[in-house]
């Protein structure tokens, strides 16, 4: 596994992994962290362990999750589960079970799309480190312990101090326009919230 103290932020899902991991790496570096994107993009996981990075944004495929046993991510997310790769996994249930492994042993935050009951169930059934929280992503106004969108702002009601009464503006939807054009898709907004 990784050297002690270097957090892994793990991302899986049928669609959006590469985009989300790329954004996550940019956010971490903008915040001053020496971050590396690893997995299917960037550096292979096996080589990343030897790098000097302080934190890893890790893209994990269902194939990698099927064989991964020793990862304890600081935070993890399954963006979505669509029925692809069934030829390899054998069934939609087996595929979803492999994707669900991203949440195993998560230390701080199990992030999931609030509108996706299948992924929410993965979080509920995961064997996590005591104290890990479930954090939902909403494309509208977020409930407590969610991130969401209010009046064109991506907002946090999960990690702010008084989350029952306050939300923290993280970014403006227009911040995504350089990459996604003036009207980012729901998928782009969801990936940005995930990152």
Model-derived features: where do they sit?
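Adenine nucleotide phosphate-binding catalytic loops in nucleotide-utilizing enzymes
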Residues: 89-93, 131-195
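Phosphate-binding loop of NTP-binding sites
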Residues: 1-133, 146-159
